[in-house]
Each structure stands twice: as C-alpha cells, then as structure tokens.
Amino acid sequence: MKIINIKIIRNNINNFSLPQHITPGSAGLDLLACIEKPVSILPKETRLIPTGIAIYIEDIEVAGIILPRSGLGHYYGIVLGNTIGLIDSDYQGEIMISLWNRGSNKFILYPGKRIAQLLFISILRVKLSLVKSFDPFMKTIRGVKGFGHSM
C-alpha cells in the first residue's frame, strides 16, 4: 500500500472526517465540502469549493484524479466544472473542487457534504521521439480517422 501525505489546511475540517474509502471496494476516497455555512449554487453557476486538505504525492509515477460523484450529477445536475481534475505529484496546495450546477434548480451545498472522489493512478512516463512519418509497414486499420470514425 502506498502512503500519501495529507495536511489539514482549514481548521473547520476537524468537524468532518478526512478522505476515506466508504466501503472496502471503493476505488476513490470521498472529498468533503469544507465550508462553514451552506452555499447556494444557482443553475448554470460554478463555485470553487475548498476541501480543507492538501496532499503531497511526491512519487512522479503517481497522480491524483478528481472525479465527480455520480449521484450529485444524476439527481441534482451538480458536476465538476472542469469535468475531471488532475493533481500532479509535486502539487502541495489545497485541493479545491469546481462544482457546476448544470441543472435548472438551485442546489444548496451543506458543510461536510461529499462532493467529489479522489482516485490515485499510476503514470507511465514517456519520452517523445520526433519522426517525419510513421513506418508504412505499421499502418493501422484506423489510420488518421478521428471523431466519429466508427459510427
């Protein structure tokens, strides 16, 4: 098991639990809204919500991914404003969550509400090699076909 250092940034996080796997099979750690009072998010509005914590991954072969909570999106229209978040191994600042209300009703976010999931992934480090063309013997069926090519 990999150890990731976590630091408390906001004192009011002591009122809530630290990120944790809710069930033994949970892939992500739940991140909570570290706010002191309820926050309204109007339809089509985006708000930046603090989690009250910072992490330091340190290992360059690991990154953190911030993912939305499916229930918030499905039932309330609350999704991540940037669709997905990336935490680089050398970032040490507070984890902030951009929440976007894509729904048609005002959403009230309460202190301590689970708002996103933090997932750690392995990173494959690569070195790019500039070429003038790809080997003609290595042609693929797809080739250069892009968006909608398999419809």
Swiss-Prot record:
Keyword line: Hydrolase, Magnesium, Metal-binding, Nucleotide metabolism
EC number: 3.6.1.23
Alphabetized InterPro entries for the sequence: dUTPase, dUTPase-like, dUTPase-like_sf, dUTPase_trimeric
Catalysed conversion reaction: dUTP + H2O = dUMP + diphosphate + H(+)
The keyword Methyltransferase appears for this protein: no
Binding site for substrate: R69, S70, G71, N82, L86, I87, D88, M96
Example GO BP: dUTP catabolic process
Pathway involvement of the protein, from the record: Pyrimidine metabolism; dUMP biosynthesis; dUMP from dCTP (dUTP route): step 2/2
Co-factor(s): Mg(2+)
A GO term, aspect molecular function: dUTP diphosphatase activity
TM segment ranges: none
Keyword Metal-binding: yes
Family annotation (Gene3D superfamilies): 2.70.40.10
Pfam families attached to this UniProt entry: dUTPase
Coiled coil location: none
Protein function: This enzyme is involved in nucleotide metabolism: it produces dUMP, the immediate precursor of thymidine nucleotides and it decreases the intracellular concentration of dUTP so that uracil cannot be incorporated into DNA.
Family membership: Belongs to the dUTPase family.
Name listed for the protein in its UniProt record: Deoxyuridine 5'-triphosphate nucleotidohydrolase
